[in-house]
């Protein structure tokens, strides 16, 4: 009905205390790592755009099925954070801060499996957010360059 702002606002709505608690626990663990890696503004942009990306994929699949469900929650945006961290871990050769590629992939698989085997979990929003976060990280994240000592002094002889 043209109410496209709902693709944005759904990220801030939740279906109860347990729903918001689960999302906030993951956000508290993963968010600061990504914010430190990307900076405040890029992190905020990624979070918001990944949330809209998750909502959009969810909506597109509802149109394709012809079945419309209520969808809400921050998990699309949070999966966007996970997708971005997956890219960052990949370009840092499988490890970044306390994260490993295997650990992130395990978490993604377990989370999606839980969603598939549970009732009323919008995996399309999760997948959309994950993909959007991954793509945005490719665009926005720049691996820091190693510092070069131009003083001419040997750092190993002091």
Predicted regions and their residues:
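A detector for small-residue-rich transmembrane helices and their helix-helix packing motifs
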Residues: 1-158
């Amino acid at each position: 009905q043209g109410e496209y702002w709902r693709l944005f606002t759904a990220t801030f709505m939740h279906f109860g205390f347990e729903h918001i608690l689960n999302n906030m626990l993951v956000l508290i663990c993963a968010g600061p790592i990504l914010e430190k890696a990307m900076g405040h503004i890029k992190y905020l942009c990624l979070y918001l755009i990944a949330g809209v990306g998750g909502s959009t994929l969810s909506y597109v699949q509802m149109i394709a099925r012809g079945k419309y469900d209520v969808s809400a929650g921050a998990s699309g945006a949070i999966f966007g954070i996970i997708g971005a961290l997956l890219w960052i871990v990949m370009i840092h050769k499988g490890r970044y801060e306390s994260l490993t590629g295997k650990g992130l992939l395990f978490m993604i698989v377990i989370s999606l499996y839980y969603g598939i085997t549970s009732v009323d979990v919008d995996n399309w929003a999760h997948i959309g957010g994950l993909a959007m976060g991954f793509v945005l990280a490719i665009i926005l994240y720049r691996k820091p360059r190693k510092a070069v000592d131009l003083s001419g002094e040997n750092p190993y002889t002091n």
